[in-house]
Regions:
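A short, N-terminal "cap"/entry segment at the start of jelly-roll beta-barrel domains
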Residues: 1-15, 26-30, 106-113, 131
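N-terminal regulatory/effector-sensing and dimerization cores
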Residues: 16-106
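Solvent-exposed, amphipathic alpha-helical segments
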Residues: 45, 117-128, 176-184, 228, ...
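Aromatic/histidine-rich interaction motifs
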Residues: 99-123
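Short, Lys/Arg-enriched, Trp-marked, Pro/Gly-tolerant hinge/linker segments that flank
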Residues: 107-116, 129-144, 148-187, 191-198, ...
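Terminal helix-turn-helix DNA-binding modules in bacterial transcription factors
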Residues: 179, 183, 187-193, 200, ...
Length: 277
């Protein structure tokens, strides 16, 4: 079976930065003003999680809470005993244009028992969090990144995401077409060629793809290519070279597709992205 995450992670990395390890007692509020998400590991204790006016979530077993994008939340724990957390900021390269971050739901909660393959990583992470070893920060950050990858695996394998790219990658047939696009965006992909990758008829493939991924195959292909083009523009590469690498026959063709997808020309987008940075 093709590696569903290899091309995604090769093009769009995820990173973590640990910012807390220890007890949280009483009420702790985290706002949505920072430009990154958060991953919290609840090692022990009871926690009430609140998201605005939504019904509170009660956690009474070791669990993880992933917020791939900024989202205000509050933790309410016992004032005396609290709960033990290890927390990290998470960042998806490219921000909103990162297809991995964009494909995740706003909030994921999983009991740690649902990640059996991740137990050795979690044990090492908790051990490192308690230590004062040299390189502790770097070690914790890398371990959190491994946990993130394991979360993606679990969401696909257990069908936790109902729509979007990850839902498509969870489908035995659609995943073959998606991986082919991710690995070779420069190919001249037609609907027939993608349907052949999936082993389906054109009509069945187009319908299934739209129902699961939420986009037509052509729209998804354009979004993936333009996402790659944006990454290459940040790296300062020439538009001519980018056009060839992401599957457009000329700079003009790429510019038309880029404007259709983003509302800006590649030059305008690069200038505005540089200002924002």
């Amino acid at each position: 079976m093709a590696d569903r995450l290899a091309a995604l992670l090769a093009h769009f990395s995820v990173s973590a930065r640990t910012f807390h390890a220890g007890a949280l007692c009483g009420i702790n509020a985290l706002d949505a003003t920072e430009p990154f998400g958060q991953l919290h590991l609840v090692r022990d204790g009871r926690v009430e999680v609140r998201h605005g006016v939504r019904k509170a979530l009660e956690i009474d077993e070791p669990s993880l809470l992933l917020y791939p994008r900024p989202m205000a939340h509050r933790f309410i724990t016992d004032k005396r005993h609290g709960a033990t957390f290890v927390c990290a900021h998470v960042q998806f390269e490219g921000g909103p244009a990162n297809p991995i971050g964009a494909a995740l739901p706003p909030f994921v909660c999983l009991p740690l028992a649902r990640l059996p393959a991740c137990q050795p990583i979690l044990e090492l992470l908790f051990l490192e969090a308690e230590s004062e070893n040299c390189g502790r920060q770097a070690m914790l950050d890398r371990l959190f990144e491994l946990v993130l990858i394991q979360i993606l695996r679990v969401l696909m394998e257990q069908g936790q995401v109902e729509a979007g790219m990850l839902a498509g990658l969870a489908d035995e047939r659609l995943r073959r077409a998606l991986v082919a696009v991710h690995e070779a965006p420069e190919r001249d992909w037609s609907l027939e060629a993608l349907a052949e990758q999936a082993g389906m008829s054109r009509t069945s493939f187009a319908t299934a793809f739209r129902d699961r991924v939420g986009l037509t195959p052509g729209s998804y292909l354009q979004r993936w290519r333009i996402g790659l083009a944006q990454k290459h523009l940040r790296q300062g590469r020439s538009l001519k070279l980018i056009a060839t690498e992401v599957g457009y026959g000329s700079e003009a063709a790429l510019s038309r597709a880029f404007r259709a997808q983003t509302g800006s020309s590649p030059r305008e987008w690069r200038n505005s992205d540089a200002v924002d940075a």
